Structure formats: C-alpha cells, structure tokens
C-alpha cells in the first residue's frame, strides 16, 4: 500500500497509512509532553472537582499544577483504602471519580495480604486500547513482513470475583481480554493470533494452555512471533509442551481433540480447525522425544523472528533459559503498564533486554516523579538523565498523586518525553511470576513456620535468607535456614520441615497463593537446612569483599552466584511443601 508522504514520521518509514498516523500521534504527544500533561491534569481536576476526595482538600475548583501539588498529598494505597472499601461495599456517590467506577482491577501488589483494588472507569478501556494500537506500528519499523503470518501468544484469563457491592474485581488483562475491545477486535493483518478467543477466554488454565499450544503446533509455519505477557509464562508453555507432546501428536495424527478438553466452546471451535495430519504428528514426535531441547522454538516454529515477552525487572532472571530454548532470538519488551495505569511503550523494541527503555506517553495520566531519597516530586519533563525516581500518578479514575511503587531510571528523552529503564518494584524481595513478596511478609512467614518448629521439637530458626530459584519450571522460593536446636532437643524430622514449608506458604499473600493454586506459575516452596556456622561464613565472605563488620546485616534475599553456591555447599537437607496452600478468589473482609 502506498503511504501518504504527509503522514511520514521521524521514527522511520511506516509500513502503511494506519501506521503512519500512529507514529505521528506518538511524535505529537512526545513533542508537546508538558502541554499535554498540563491540559490533562486540568481536565481530570475539572471533571472530578465535586468528588468527595478533592473537596476534602479544599481545591475549590482549581485546575493548575501549583495549587494541586500544594493542597493534594502524595499517598499510598493504605491512605486510600477506606474510600476504596466504601466503593467496593456499594457506595455509588462520587467519592474518587465523577464517572461511575465500573470495576476494580486487582493489582499484583498486596495490602494486608490481599490484592490491592484499583478503581477504574469504562473509558479507561479506550485509553488502554489506544496504547495497544501504537505497539505494532513501532514494531513494524524494525521487523518487516509481520502481516504475512501470525503471532503465537499464550494469553489467559484469571479468576475474578465481585465485591460486596457487586463490582467485578479482576486482573487488568482479564478485564481487557473479556472486553468487546478484544473479543470483537477488527481484523488486522499485523495482529493475527494462532490462539482462538475461545481458548484464551477459557477459565480452566489446563484446557486453555492445551488448546493454545495445539493451535500453535497446527499453524507452526505461519508463526512469526512467539510471546506471553511475562517471560515466566512463555517458559511454562515450553514446559507444558515437554510434558504433553505425545498427546498433541496423538490429537494431530487422528484429528481428534483430547477427551480432557471438555469446554464446549473450545470443542466446537476446534472441530473446524483440527484435521488428521500424520506428517505433522511424526514431526512433533521426532523433535520432542529428544532430551536436547536447545533451540526448540526455532526447530518447531522455524519462521519465528522474535519473542514478545517482558524480560525487565524480576523477569530478567529468565533471559538465559529463553535464549537456550529460542537459540538466541531477540526479545521484545513492547510496553510498560500496571493495574493503576498504562504508562508508555518501547520505541526501540529490538534493543537488548538490559537496554530496554520505555517512553512515557503523556496522554495516559498525569505523571510525577519523586527522586530516590528525596521527597519533592518533579514534573515529567523535568527529570534528569541518570537519576532514579519513584513513579506517582493521577488518573481519570480518581487516583490522585498515588505512589505506584516502581523505581525507574531516566535513560534519555524522545522529543520532550523522558525514557525510563525499569529498575525494580519498591520493597519487593522475591518474585517468580506476578507474585511479589516483601521483607515484612517473608519475615512473618518465617516466624509462623518457626513456631511450628518450636511446637513440634523445641527448635527455632536462628537465621535465614531466601532465593528465587528459576532453574526449575515453574520457579519456586527457596529458604535457607540455620536452626537453633537446644541441648537435649530432638532434630526436626523431614515431616516437620515439610509442614514448615506449607506453613510459610499459608502465611504468604493471596497473589502468591493464587500463583501456586490456580495459575501453576510458582512451584512448591523449598526449605534448605544449612549446617551451623553457615551464616557466619556468609558474613566473613561479605566482609572480605569490603562490607563493614559494624554495619553488616544478613541479606534476606540473595542472587549473587558465589553466595548461592556457598549456601548450597552447606546444605544438609532439603524439604518441599507437601501440598497446595489454601486459596479462593474471595477476598477476606477487613
């Protein structure tokens, strides 16, 4: 298709006229970032002027930035929790937003062990869809020909519930996949998936994964990109193929869907897709029966050009494994988003994972940034390259000066919009998938498990640290325990220590427990008991590397390979959680 030269973009030559318009929109927003931000805040404040929250701080209809920042405090979820609970309980008065709260998006972050509830309004779907619509126009600048094939993406809906007041409470991606924006999306040759909607929307994770993988195998030569939301999700899909390849080959050979797939909509959908193909079945058997799974992605899907997965932050730990399975394919991190707000996109999606930077789109929300170690928030356009900041957002849905908890480092600017490298989540100690465990949660879990130990054999945990082990699929938490066994007390049995593992899991937050029970994205927690004196050796090692003996504290999480190796060399026994912890979609009442 010929592209109107008036629609060209400084980002590069667009693939089509639709792309050209999207790229020009990015240019317009980023060139005028400060004006866009000023106008956006004024619009939010004018719209929500009569809400209970803004009236509480006597804003009196003011819409300028100075008055806003003088009168409205920077807050955390706990500050807003009473208002959110009232909305959840059914209060429909304009508490936070002049527009009705349509649902709650459940964050992977937690408060008092439960997922945080982020209020949202219907029009936010349009805003999120707008950001999605910018991703492929940017990708097409770097990878040509994506309209000639399909994407094999492993996408899933998760458990949802309703609040006491009847509002849905569900993860942001579940909300999006169930929306008309996704289910009735118009045909776009640059955005065709191998997975049918029926498989993506199936609430049974096994049936959904099975069907999506089967469709990807049937369409293997059409696949040009392979992806999931997180790197860990793509690795679970590969592990699923390792476990079930013989069943896939059987289905493909006979053209019959496995009897364990009982979802009626899936069975009806697959009846028009699955036909006998003995040649493909034999190919799958030949490739998958080998113990060598190196480059398995490009062996089965030979036309794959890149992986579309998040490999920044905690997901960076999966990069070596993905490189092994893909043969070193590029990994594209395309966008930066959360339950609170969608933030921006990667304008150089083929960059190395360690160099990924996201450009903040100033039309998504009003953004402020608190310098690390500081207190005064600065504007979007006033951040400094090389500095680290905590992200603060004000949204149309009623979050005002809300601390998201993400730590970002400024790497540069695109026009006047800053570009950020995601550094970490504030206070997060352990993470395998969407789970996030902080130090206080881990400490509480260890204390509860230590009580089990004391009750059963009189022992206690003398010292501990932890490690997110991603060498297994799925990954799992490892706790290194040094025990204090009193004179005359018996050594704890294997059964006691496995109960300690389960006791810890029961003490962790609901996102962790959902990951274990419903999503199968985290494996059983492991306790590795180390011999006495190990943590003194750990301190000696740290001091030998320059740590101050007066200021040394035992790290509650380790990831430096020599330290992990030191701990593993001192392990005297290992124990795993014997069963799944308790979890239901229902939220605990506070």
Curated annotation (Swiss-Prot):
Keyword entries, A-Z: Ligase
Annotated InterPro entries: GH3, GH3_C, GH3_M
Example GO BP: response to auxin
Induction, per UniProt: By auxin.
Highest taxon above the source species: Eukaryota
UniProt GO MF annotations: ligase activity
Name of a matching Pfam family: GH3
Enzyme Commission code: 6.3.2.-
Family membership: Belongs to the IAA-amido conjugating enzyme family.
Function: Catalyzes the synthesis of indole-3-acetic acid (IAA)-amino acid conjugates, providing a mechanism for the plant to cope with the presence of excess auxin.
Name of protein: Probable indole-3-acetic acid-amido synthetase GH3.1
Native species: Arabidopsis thaliana (Mouse-ear cress)
């Amino acid at each position: 298709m010929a592209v109107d030269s008036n629609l060209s973009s400084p980002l590069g030559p667009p693939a089509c006229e639709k792309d050209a318009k999207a790229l020009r929109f990015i240019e317009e927003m980023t060139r005028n970032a400060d004006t866009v931000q000023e106008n956006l805040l004024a619009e939010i404040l004018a719209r929500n002027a009569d809400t209970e929250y803004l009236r509480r701080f006597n804003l009196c209809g003011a819409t300028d930035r100075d008055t806003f920042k003088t009168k409205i405090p920077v807050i955390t979820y706990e500050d807003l929790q009473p208002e959110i609970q009232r909305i959840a309980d059914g209060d429909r008065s304009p508490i936070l937003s002049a527009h009705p709260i349509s649902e709650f998006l459940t964050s992977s972050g937690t408060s008092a062990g439960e997922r945080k509830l982020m209020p949202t309004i219907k029009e936010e779907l349009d805003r999120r869809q707008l950001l999605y619509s910018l991703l492929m126009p940017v990708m097409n600048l770097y990878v040509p020909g994506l309209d000639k094939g399909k994407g094999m993406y492993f996408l899933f809906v998760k458990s949802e519930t309703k609040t006491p007041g009847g509002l849905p409470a569900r993860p942001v991606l579940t909300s999006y996949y169930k929306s008309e924006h996704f289910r009735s999306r118009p045909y776009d040759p640059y955005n065709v998936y191998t997975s049918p909607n029926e498989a993506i929307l199936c609430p049974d994770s096994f049936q959904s994964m099975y069907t999506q993988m089967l469709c990807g195998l049937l369409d293997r030569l059409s696949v040009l990109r392979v992806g999931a939301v997180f790197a860990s999700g793509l690795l679970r899909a590969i592990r699923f193929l390792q476990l079930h390849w013989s069943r896939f080959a059987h289905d493909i050979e006979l053209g019959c869907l496995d009897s364990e797939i009982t979802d009626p909509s899936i069975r009806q959908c697959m009846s028009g897709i699955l036909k006998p193909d003995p040649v493909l079945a034999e190919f799958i058997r030949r490739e998958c029966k080998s113990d060598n799974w190196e480059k398995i992605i490009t062996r089965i899907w030979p036309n794959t050009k890149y992986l579309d997965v998040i490999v920044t932050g905690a997901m960076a730990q999966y990069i070596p494994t993905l490189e092994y399975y893909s043969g070193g394919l590029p990994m594209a991190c395309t966008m930066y988003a959360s339950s609170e707000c969608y933030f921006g996109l990667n304008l150089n999606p083929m960059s190395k994972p360690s160099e990924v930077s996201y450009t903040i789109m100033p039309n998504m929300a009003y953004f402020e940034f608190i310098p690390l170690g500081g207190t005064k928030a600065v504007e979007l356009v006033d951040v400094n390259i090389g500095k680290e900041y905590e992200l603060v957002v004000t949204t149309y849905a009623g979050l005002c000066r809300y601390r998201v908890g993400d730590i970002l480092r400024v790497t540069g600017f695109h026009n006047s919009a800053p570009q950020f490298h995601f550094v970490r989540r504030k206070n997060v100690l352990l993470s395998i998938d969407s789970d996030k465990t902080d130090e206080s949660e881990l400490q509480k879990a260890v204390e509860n498990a230590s009580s089990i130990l004391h009750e059963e054999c009189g022992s206690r945990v003398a010292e501990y640290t932890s490690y997110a082990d991603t060498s297994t699929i799925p990954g799992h938490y490892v706790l290194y325990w040094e025990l204090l066994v009193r004179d005359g007390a018996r050594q704890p049995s294997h059964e006691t220590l496995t109960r300690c593992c389960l006791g810890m899991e029961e003490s962790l937050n609901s996102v962790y427990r959902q990951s274990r029970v419903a999503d199968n994205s985290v494996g059983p927690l492991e306790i590795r008991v180390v011999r006495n004196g190990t943590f003194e050796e750990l301190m000696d090692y740290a001091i030998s590397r320059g740590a101050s003996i007066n200021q040394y504290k035992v790290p509650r999480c380790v990831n430096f390979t020599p330290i992990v190796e030191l701990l593993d060399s001192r392990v005297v026994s290992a124990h795993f959680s014997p069963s799944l912890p308790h979890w239901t979609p229902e939220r605990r009442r506070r």
